[in-house]
Amino acid sequence: MDITDRILQNRIVSKVIFFVLRSVTLSLVSVTRFSLFLLSFATITVPKWAYKIVTYSLTIQFNFKSLLFLFFVSICVVILVVRYRYLNKYARLPHEAPIKEAKLGPDTNIRPSEPRIGFQNYLDEFLSAISIFGYLEKPVFVELARHIRTQRVAEGNTIYLGEQSSFILVVDGCFQVFTAPEKDSAEVVEEAGQPEYRLLTEVSNGAPLSSFFTVLELFTELIPEATSKENPFKSTTSSLRPGSSTTTEAGANNASKPHMPQPKKARIIAKAKIDTTIAVIPANAFHHLVHKFPNSSAQIVQVILTRFQRVTFSTGYEYLGLSDAIFSIEKNFNSLTAYELPNYIRSDIIDDFKKEAMSEHLSQASNESFIVLRSKGAQSRLSNQYFSKAFDKEHGNFVSDIDRSTANAGDLLSSTNPHSTLLSTSVGPLRKFPLNRSYSREVGDYDISASFRDGLLQCIFKSLGVFNYELKEDNDDLCTENDSSEGDSDSLKKVDFLGQIAMMSATDREEVKSSIVVSTKKSTILEFAKEIEIIFYKKGTTIVRQGDHADGLYYIIDGFLDATCPSKLTFSTSYDTDLGMHSFMIKPGGIVNYQACVSNYRSFINVTARSDVLVGFLPRSCLERIIDQEPLISLTIAKRLISLVPSLLLKLDFAVGWIHLNPDQVVYEKNDPSDCVYVVLNGRLRSIEDERGSARTQVDYFNEYGKGDSVGELEMLLNNRRSSTLFAIRDSELAKIPETLFNALSLSHPAVGLQLSKIIANRMNLLLNNKSMDGMQHQPHEKHSIRTLAIVPSSSTGLLILFSQKLTSVLSVMGKSVKVLRQSSVLEHLGKHAFSRMGRFKLSSYLSDLEDKYDILIYVADSGVGSAWLQTCIRQADCIYILAEADQNPNIGEYEQHLIAMKSTARKELVLLHPERFCPSGLTRLWLKERPWVYAHHHVQLRIGLDNEISQNNEAKVFLNIIRAKVQNLHYGFRKYIDWKHLHPVYQANRAQDSDFARLARRICGKAIALVLGGGGARGISQIGILYALEEAGIPFDIIGGTSIGAFNGGLYAWEADLVPMFGRAKKFCGRMANLWRFVLDVTYPQAAYTTGHEFNRGIWKTFGEIHIEDFWLPFYANTTNITHSRMDIHSSGYAWRYIRASMSLAGLVPPMLSDSGDMLLDGGYMDNLTVSHMQSLGASSIFAIDVGSEDSREPMHYGDTVSGVWALISRWIPFIPKTSFPSLAEIQSRLTYVTSVATGEKVKSMPGCFYMRPPVKDFPTLEFGSFEKIYNVGYNYGKEYVEKLKTSHKLDDILSPRDTSKRHPKFLSSRRNSL
């Protein structure tokens, strides 16, 4: 076997060797052959072919026709390549998705609060009810909770609220509140079981059954009645000699004063509709609260007074037309509480005051209607002159060295320790008010002007009801129960709140200690008397204007005033209707501005000087300091006020509900029952119509309601269900007026029904005026009255404070009172715990008061991300400005992320800050596509240098952050250096009204000035001339809108807001349009139009390039006619050339333009050639509309019932045949297409706030673009004449001369300390 195997192995090896050697041999042979082939090809074949080619000859022959044909073919190829490769770059622009509108609906997870049952959320119900008290410190809350008790009331039982001396809260169930009608009314309500009562309202879970008036009565119950049975100026000496004992009665006019009226007890009962559980806080709880916490009690009373005024008074006056009831309070106060100065003071001093006032007026030669009389030093000339006369006459030069201890004439009061203070440190019954002061016997120290001021202050306090008295003894007995609840007395049980409050942490207790601020400053009456200003008003001067916030009390020293209360129904559209005028005369000793100053609210009356008048002005700040020193004085003032309130307002107080809403909280939903009307007291609401059944919520329409607006009257009267969903945009306060209240008041006071009818009529008129917008897409209606504005940075920036300062200064120049709120200012006013859990109530009350005092509040979010102040800014804003530097990274910043997380539905607007007045193409879209929730955007030029950066102490760190951010975003800054378009001169605003901040301020104030340009072909050149004339007159524009050629001109102006580049670009475009050869070469087979549209497209694209509409410096829109959906579309984003071309697309001349979604768009003039209605919906108050459309003949025609085209053609050439007017086919089609536009254009001429202009260019044809200079001059001359007419009629005063607030009432003067 071994031998055989070896033999086999040897054979195999030999075969392998053989195959290997064979393969190698064959490979070598192949390589050799290929090498020989290459060598042969290179040395023989190639030279041979080269020789043949060089020596080969070819002859080609062409005739002239062939050469001409080849030439034209070559030309066509070149034209086609250039046409479709280089000249239509506009068709190859990158597709830009349309920017979607921001979602303005509420969070779908937020719904109206469901009724709560039983005691599951009893503490929440209690907290909700006592929220009418405002901010409560925790010890005060514990004191109230300690006395609360519950009671079960069976169905049908009644409680007499008019006689109830407890605070009642409905925990579970429902009460019906009834009132007794007037004696002269025979109408009854049978459902109450008591035929003499009418239903006012229904009160259900969580709502207080007691009214504001009841709460004030509980706090002031122990305050004794302020009577004037005795003369307050009795037993004073008749001479000025110190120590004299001879007495006389001064001020004889005050000898017999009427008693103050007792507080009205309204006949109001509450009937349990079902078995109901109530919570009761008895009267003694409030009495103990007054003794233990006088400062907090005064604060609660002030909050209740303000809300009583803001809810009850304001609703009754502005909405229900109860001006007579409101006016009676001021009238009764002056008729019952007038305290004149003593005769020995009024005799000579007043004459000297008048002489000094007249001499000062003549010396100043001023046109001012008031003069603030000021002392010339510590010892005034007037006082020394008066004292020296009286002293020399009576006593010669004798002066006693003994300090005076008896009453002297001129002191008005008995002596007291000069170092006595107004407030001691003890807390208990009200101490006697130390209105007394003593003077030195030396003549140099005796200042009768100080005694005069003391007398004024005393008269003011006596008018307010502040006399020398002490509190009554507190009655600790519980208030008696009414008959209907006697059987349920066993169910009265105590509620344990202490367990809830014991859970408060040590930190919360520390917050309580720090939140109770007790003033330690002890001031004498002299220090407060120095605050009084002596002001002389000339006859006819308006001292108090209706709607102004109270800044102090006016005491009439001499002269007469007229107080008037115009009955006005003010609508949100600034439509006022005068319904009458109430008036009375205020005599010396009377008080002006009482109601507004006591409640710290705005005035309801106008007060003018009937004659030259001398008044003493006590600032509101001084009164507040006095109340801080002696808190219980506020209870006395409140008791005097509630004694003057008529019974009608008391009934209104029980029926009108006060509601506080959080952001995004829904008031009612669509299809809910309509049983009440809501009036916005503070905040902002939005109503929307949506489709809940669909997969996504489709917002079809919305409207916004600000302060003073009402919602729901039409549905309530028609007994229809709610047609929309209403929700709160931010923290809001509403007054709820039930339908039952309207029914009750309409029977006894028919004026209420008339008032409501006027509201409905005005609302229907607005709906009819808005019908012109039904054919377009549903667009949001901007509300004009922005009361609160939040400025939030996109990321950390040092321009936040500078931006807010510039905006505030412009708003102030426009006549608006503005308050800027920063975190530091709020903390300084409210303390370090202002943003704590309990401090939010105090913060909310503080912000509400500021909103009542100022026209606009600006919240500057200058805190860190996620801070409580940032959340407050967002929650309180009607509109949010997101501040960003345009040359930075457009990604969403950290502040914006926090804003998105809060899901705020307030309108958010992006403000892009540019160092130059220029925006590169496409830059704005980079910012907007990342922020679909942005509603609008603004371009603002804000230059900042190193001086501005380091102007504040804390700017060093900010400056470093700016440097770091600029380095990180450096590649964005290179855009302006490499873009050739930036090399053109940049426009600079030279006038104040042309600045970007003035434009923002006008938008905020609802005074935006808009420009609407109509279509008309070449006649639109005249619009440029009119614009030049308007700009010469100083008229700025904030929003631009246009149709057809108006869209072209408007786009050019909105691009850079400068007429110089606009003029050049427009003239260049008209030159292209005047070249008819361009359109001849563009003619094609008339499938969709007679031309391809290329030359038209290229002419517009050569003008605008790749710029987007959102890159325009001014807001701009163009309208088109969407023939796919038969509607009018508004375009405010996308490529400018594309939508301007769509707005200029005449049917038949150029094909329709396609939108991004494939819709066919034609000239917007077919639907509305002058879009004034849409411009009004954007918030413009003044609109300049320029109409250059063709005027069709309105002459009647008489061509018969049939028309022969042949006879019409022949009749033109036969002279002896009577000429008959025949319409052409083109004219008929043109009139047909413009039917809708003509109808809307006629309405424009009569719209309020619209300045309609129609230059005389009807003789120029539509395509007469070659007459540029001629048409331009016609427009310019017409514009000059129109502006002169407006100036002559003073219609441009508000636009050209914004109201300046530098000359205002003397209560705003800074130097008050030197007034006499």
From Swiss-Prot:
GO terms for molecular function: lysophospholipase activity. Residues 233-256 have a biased composition (Polar residues). Intracellular phospholipase B that catalyzes the double deacylation of phosphatidylcholine (PC) to glycerophosphocholine (GroPCho). Plays an important role in membrane lipid homeostasis. Responsible for the rapid PC turnover in response to inositol, elevated temperatures, or when choline is present in the growth medium. Residues 229-262, 1296-1316 are annotated as: Disordered. It comes from the Eukaryota. Residues 1-23, 83-1316 are cytoplasmic. Belongs to the NTE family. It is a multi-pass membrane protein. This is Lysophospholipase NTE1. Residues 45-61 are lumenal. Its EC number is 3.1.1.5. GO terms for cellular component: cytoplasm; endoplasmic reticulum; endoplasmic reticulum membrane. A nucleoside 3',5'-cyclic phosphate 2 binds at residues 640-763.
